[in-house]
Amino acid sequence: MWVFGYGSLIWKVDFPYQEKMVGRIRGYSRRFWQGSTDHRGVPGKPGRVVTLVEDPEGCVWGVAYRLPAGQECEVKAYLDFREKGGYRTTTVVFYPKDSSIKPFDVLLYIGTRDNPNYLGPAPLQEIAEQIIDAVGPSGRNTEYLFELANSMRNLVPEDVDEHLFSLEETSKGTPGKRTKPKLPLE
């Protein structure tokens, strides 16, 4: 079983895997439209993390992970818990960056529009301010944004994810409320 990562699964790999491969899926675009009250924000002050939205012309680069033989159910159960908060799973075709490898199916987690944490579209500046101000049990929301952008630049320099990179630039240039939010007590 293969799982596709397009957000924190790209840079925060805390599960066992047998193999990983850079590639893309088609028919979607990555957007910071999913609220996070369990990882990058808290109830009443959610952070924003990525989900995918259907886009016939879209292409999302990421990393596919092959789960270890005999541990698929255990690792999937862990990922189901990690990706809680409104995500559903579906299967899509993955196109490896290495074109000598044939496309294959991967499991994909998507935050749906009808889930309680879905925030939807907003002006880029508003999304940036929300990310700057949010912090949750997994850390600052800006860490999530900046790690994802850096990872995509390193893995796929040719990627032109305008939403991701514009949001990164806007967040770095937003003076706003740059006070350090207090981390939740553990």
Swiss-Prot record:
Pfam families: ChaC (PF04752). Keywords: Cytoplasm, Lyase. It comes from Gallus gallus. It is found in: Cytoplasm, Cytosol. It catalyses: glutathione = L-cysteinylglycine + 5-oxo-L-proline. Signal peptide: none annotated. This is Putative glutathione-specific gamma-glutamylcyclotransferase 2. Its main location: cytoplasm. GO terms for biological process: glutathione catabolic process. Its EC number is 4.3.2.7. It is an enzyme of class 4 (lyase). Monomer. Belongs to the gamma-glutamylcyclotransferase family. ChaC subfamily. Coiled coil: none annotated. Catalyzes the cleavage of glutathione into 5-oxo-L-proline and a Cys-Gly dipeptide. Acts specifically on glutathione, but not on other gamma-glutamyl peptides. Substrate binds at V3, F4, G5, Y6, G7, S8. It comes from the Eukaryota. GO terms for cellular component: cytoplasm; cytosol. The active site is at E83. SUPFAM superfamilies: Gamma-glutamyl cyclotransferase-like. GO terms for molecular function: glutathione specific gamma-glutamylcyclotransferase activity.
